[in-house]
Amino acid sequence: MPKKNSPLLPKETTTTQSSVDTSGSSNLTWPVSEHSIRRPLWARLLGQMLDPWLDLSIEPEHSVQYNDGRPIIYVLEDYGLCNTLILDKACRKTKLPSPLIPLPDNPLQRKRAYLALSRRSSSNSLIPNQRGGKTHSDSLANLLQAHRIRDTLDVHLVPVSIFIGRTPDRQSGWFAVLFSENWALVGRFRRLLAVLLNGRNTIVCFAPPISVRQTLNEGLPPERTLRKLQRVLRTHFRRIRETVIGPDLSTRRLLVDNVLATEAVREAIAAQAKRDGTDLSETWRKAQAYAWEIAADYSSPVIRSADFLFSHVWNRIYAGVLIHHVDSFKETAPGHEVVYVPSHRSHIDYMLLSYCLYQCGIVLPHIVAGINLNLPIVGTLLRKCGAFFIRRSIKGNMLYSIVLSEYVAQLVAGGYSLEYFIEGGRSRTGRLLQPKGGMIMMTLQAFLRQPRRPVLFQPIYIGYEKLIEGTSYLDELSGEPKKKESIWRLFWNIPKVLKQKYGQVVVNFGEPIALNDVLAELAPEWEGQALNENEKPAWLSSTVNHLARQIQTRINSAADVNPINLLALALLSTPKHAMGEADLIAQITLCKKILLELPYSNRVTVTPHTPERIIAHAEQINILTRVHHPLGDVLRVDGDNAVLLSYFRNNVLHLFTASAWVACCFKNNRRMSRIALIRLGVGMYPFLQAELFLPWTEDQFAQHIQQVIELFVREGLLLSAGNEEEDPLTRNTSQTDEVFRLRAISHSLQQAFERYYITISILVKNGPGTLSASELESLCQLAAQRLSLLYASTAPEFFDKGLFRGFIQKLRELNLVWPDTYSKLLFDERLDTSAKDAQVILGRELRHTIERISPEATKPAPK
């Protein structure tokens, strides 16, 4: 299970924080050991009494060191005996100076080396006229004054945040949840109870030091310097608290009221009432019902309770959940409005990602969920965990659309993080689906209306070894309609799920996308000013489309290659989905070598297991069958497992694009020059890029092909007569092991090229001006289904209309086809050139079969 980490500290962007200096020195030195000066007796006695109840998690994880010789004063958010003792223990644990030993010459004028920004209120709330205390810290004012008097003094302030019971242990009981950390400043007794119940889950966050001397050197008046330093520290503590436990959440009712009170919703209500001829009050109630149907009902106690439950569930059905690259995200995220945009493979994605974020000390986002999941009991629990529900289709319902947009705008303006799946639904094939830009558009418009905090899109790849929905996906891919979700089916399936093992899950954080950077590139005319609600700049749609594709590309660039992915790549390349054990080991070894020696990106992760361990693991989770034979064991996948395995091959198909291209070129050709191989690859690349969300430019893809060639030559898969562009590359003529492995690598892209040739063949056969894009899609699907029946069995996505639609759209973008006034597709001789290029890749028999089965459009009978 993921390790429980507390959040890394955000980097302050203020002038004072950025002026941290660790290169200078001071005449004063601070002892780093407690042996020379002992802590007060009361602190030692109380510390010993409290020690059994405390278990500290220190951030940053590595030992904190401030060893440049300058004195340290710790800054707490508020005073309190428990906080003081916890800080003292944390300093002893990290071998830092004790906060209970005063500095030389005592610049704080206190018998200690820490201060707090605010004191827990001890005023009597029953006395209405009692005034609060001072608005600034006397200790901080004394420290600044000491620096003005003594030029040699240079103290470092180290902000320290303390959170007790942010994630109570499962063993600590449900009562502990009531006393876990929140936004309220609590009294001494409640704080003591929190320590007794949740002290073993205490997080102590040390921040980088702030130089008081450099702050004074800015030359501000004394009062302004004090106010500015306090503001910087308050901002820091607020950001850390938001990162750990989330923003101070408003109630669901307040959020709904705010949505209904916006100008846009009021205008939409009036317009809808006028169109329908109804009273304003009736239409207002309709809008209110929409808002209540959408809104989340975020509840920290329910979230903490769900953590207890799902920890047991994940431990039961999964062999671990691995999280990669989350630390770099935690360094970047503070100060941003974060939008999590994960891949969508399973209903488990919702709960799994929330669980991982919570375990990593990150506040849960508000999650967009389909209204189909708003089931009795389940829907309520999901709302309590931050889900808000939207309808699958909102086209034509202007009032609902505006209510939803305003709800999202309220979340963005309130600083809540969001999570949504831009594919619109779960992928049934294992590929990333073409993105839908609706939620991105709402997020972008909300930001442009109130550009307060920068927005950060965080792509996330979720990889499984076995799918809980595997059986239902098989039914849907075979043509059965999707079954409607129901609470009874859910409860009926729970025992079945809990009895099975689903392998390991990997969650990879991709490279984040800063919205401001995208706007600077695509909308340089926007200068950060707020836009009106109805204002839609010309660049808005293109920016949304760019963001959507960029997110999908970054998700693919953070893929994880697990044992099942590697097995699928190897076994599905053979006609009977079977290999001898030695051949399978060799093929897996080659795939891993390609991934490790030619890395796709620095965020792709590859299983560390050996091929032998991979095979054993697949047998353990009942994916692989071993057939014993005197000449050597054969390993195979049968029946439904073979179809499901294509899902896991498609997860990582993009990682082998360049190597599969090179291998395809030698499947039906024994000899080819480097320059021809690269030229054809660059010509084919736009279509592969559109389908697989590849990150390279055409020149970068050409370089990648060159690197693949060099690797294949080193491995003996290809023979090279020289290193010049015109020098031929050849493969062996006989059926050697090298030829077998080369053919296996080529298989992953073979079906894509077959689909491309089917499309071009049907266009050419029917002639220009005959078929519309939708008619062409339908004919392509029919031809692909027939080819699958006649030529060889293929994966169900081979005749997926969406893949043909994407290829046709790319043909239009490249102006290889274009519509006439009747929306029929026209083309010229360039399409014939593309058809000739396909002869290099596809065999003569296959090309002939495709040309023969390519259907013609039904023509009207002559009158």
From Swiss-Prot:
UniProt-listed Enzyme Commission number(s): 2.3.1.15
Q: Where is this motif: HXXXXD motif?
A: 343-348
Any one cellular component term from GO for this entry? plasma membrane
Primary localization = membrane
| Pathway annotation | Phospholipid metabolism; CDP-diacylglycerol biosynthesis; CDP-diacylglycerol from sn-glycerol 3-phosphate: step 1/3
Q: How does it sit in the membrane?
A: Peripheral membrane protein
Give the compositionally biased regions (Polar residues).
12-29
Q: Which stretches does the entry tag as region Disordered?
A: 1-29
Kindly provide the name given to this protein in its UniProt entry.
Glycerol-3-phosphate acyltransferase
**Gene name tied to this protein:** plsB
